[in-house]
Amino acid sequence: STHCISSAASDVYKRQAEWDHAARFFWNTVVNHRSVCIGGNSVREHFHPSDNFTSMLNDVQGAETCNTYNMLRLTKMLYQNSGDVDNSNKPDPRYVDYYERALYNHILSSQEPDKGGFVYFTPMRPGHYRVYSQPETSMWCCVGSGLENHTKYGEFIYAHQQDTLYVNLFIPSQLNWKEQGVTLTQETLFPDDEKVTLRIDKAAKKNLTLMIRIPEWAGNSKGYEITINGKKHLSDIQTGASTYLPIRRKWKKGDMITFHLPMKVSLEQIPDKKDYYAFLYGPIVLATSTGTENLDGIYADDSRGGHIAHGRQTPLQEIPMLIGNPDSIRHSLHKLSGSKLAFSYDGNVYPTQKSKSLELIPFFRLHNSRYAVYFRQASEEQFKTIQEEMATAEQKATDLANRTVDLVFPGEQQPESDHGILYEASETGTHKDRHFRRAKGWFSYNLKVKEEASQLMITVRQEDRNLSLIHISEPTRLGMI
């Protein structure tokens, strides 16, 4: 399939320049400052501070699929009008870089391949897992958008503009470009194989330009080694930024364009520059399985919060920590032979793995398992101190989690809705990067209870500590605070 770059949607942007500026500012902020390696964003459906991704690494309610669904819709619209913004009359391939990253690593990973269930939250907490919807129990927002997500893998592969065809994504496909009388077939096993072949099955007798995308992760055009009908195509494009390589000629039936994508292993630090890193191969995020135990509720029931992975949270000190500097860590990951992507890490790892090395595969292929996408990195000198600090913090967090019957985050829409919020003359806001609800009148929640529950823990401002704040309704009265 293909789109025309001048669309009704982009016409709206042309008429509303201030909207266009706001949309691009939002896109740049989310993509470059608030997104993790899979292209997703947010914790508990809210943006955390852009300079602190701690909650993303700790919380089990990680990147929401609907957010990425909408970011891809916005990306497509901005791409279609991007040439008008800088007066280049050419679309900006940086939008395709993000689209590709989010498509392969978040969207493709959000459907369970056996039963077809959809994912609501994708935790980035190392050692946790995802929950999958079921037809009779789960009609979440991420099921509705999920039904759309997996029908749209073909919509962004190509774009056209007058007599120019843009090849954006490397996905097996056939294009019928009716306006120019061209039929083209793309053959590839990407990302398992670097080879891409474009075959002209039908062509009109006129000059047309083929624009082949050179992604940012490819480095420069030298690695492409483009051949046309077996003869090397020379190009003087040298860039580390995303761009297009133009080939203009009078195409004929049977013409074959072949190139190899220069994919390599890279190490990407979490955006707030904590010592957590993810491995990528080209644009593909890699992950390791950390076990299949205690996957409580992996297939969602119809309970409140059935979309959340409520099972045991693996203590972070039990997750593989990579010992060494980032450069040595990157060079310790090696591609294995075989038809499917797989990698072996032979560097220094703590805790020591049962097998001799750590095995990683594309995240989108890792299902029905706990996993780690981000890994803690430490030098030899930092290692012992970090272990002690993590063990102390994790013990406190684990003790609290094991004692917790229910949990609500005041001022956050979905947690409050899930807990039956009622209020009168109440307002919400944020203070020091935390959401709050203020009771000028009153507000209430419905909380789960257990007979053995004996405490209610709340967070209040220091100046409010001595006020009479909480009433617990009968028949379960824990006391007055």
Question: What feature does the model see in each segment?
Answer:
Residues 1, 7-10, 40-64, 115-139:
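Carbohydrate-binding/catalytic loop surfaces
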Residues 23, 97-105, 110, 114-199, ...:
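C-terminal beta-rich recognition modules with glycine/proline-rich loops and embedded aromatic residues
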Residues 209-216, 451-466:
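A short beta-strand element within beta-rich, extracytoplasmic domains
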Residues 225-256, 263-271:
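A surface-exposed beta-strand-loop module
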Residues 4-16, 55-59, 70-87, 197-202:
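Well-ordered alpha-helical scaffold segments within catalytic/enzyme domains
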Residues 198-206, 437-439, 443-454:
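Extracellular and analogous surface-interaction loops
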Residues 221-230, 467-477:
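Short, surface-exposed beta-strand/strand-loop-strand elements in extracellular ectodomains
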Residues 2-9, 13, 470-471, 478-481:
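Single conserved hydrophobic/aromatic residue that forms the stacking wall/gate
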